[in-house]
């Protein structure tokens, strides 16, 4: 018995030593300095300056890019410069923590991929030092992997999505459970939108520093009883002998049963597609064809379209009208005020209050107006006047929405985009300072 235990311990120790002694061959090590001229001059998403380098595959390349001077993101882009079509970004290492000129990316003998400033300050790493890594590469599906001598992945970019999922990439219960939008095309920090894999559904949320909790504004439906999603994968599935479809495929952790929601059917190769939560709060699927030239990209799915018959047009996106506005069929066409509906432009904003004292403000009413928050958030059951009283007592409440048919109430901590419905049972009330004309509840 002692011999067996000793043998097992020796075997385990030998495996550990072999793994810990594995080193990256000199020819596979690299140190890249973020300096010199720019390398990619094709149309590039977000219109940045780009420096590309190894590793790369036929359709993917690792790059430094910046949309503001001296603030670089380490990212993977998809596209081929030969096609003269837009290059797009599908993965980022250091969103919100940009590096400067002369920053370094190092893949050394110990197998750790390290992004550091010129002075040596660590910005990002894969935490793969001394874990048996022997190489790094980008697979044909866009997954950048660090692997050991047996080919097993020690680290993979697919485990850390930002706002994008490539085909075969997942949100996972025991890993990254959400995508987060970037703030804008020119500002690469986290934006207010997130796509979250919850226990039984996939939900779009809107969050700002004014909202007490994230506000759901869209849900993907799965018409099967689910216990708990273990993962949610953007997947290409064979639709027929000649076509492929793109789906979001969930795996139930209890039954291991797969459920999916269909997204699109690209006319070209579906495997070079990605789904992204855009900075504008919409979700789009982009499909890339290596056969095309200047029209290599197709948007094959959009969550919010102006042709949507289910009420999910662009007016349901919280900041579609930027700061404030009344919207219909995707068009922001009025700026609500206590003087009536004024013409809308980008300067439209909800009224500002100088005080929380109810004596200093009033409400103006918008008949037939709805909010992005009402469809997927239950609200509370109460009377219209009680709903108003609740908002009046809450200093952070900017207005409220009421459904007279269902007697449901929603308090608005962010008003943003309102939808013009033509349904008089839906009414919005907005707080305004008393210096202006007063409307009553």
Swiss-Prot record:
Glycans are attached at residues 102, 258, 269. Phosphorylated on tyrosine. One of its GO terms (biological process) is cellular response to hypoxia. Disulfide bonds join 387-409, 391-397. Pfam families: B_lectin. Residues 1-22 form the signal peptide. Residues 356-433 form the PAN domain. This is EP1-like glycoprotein 3. It comes from Arabidopsis thaliana.
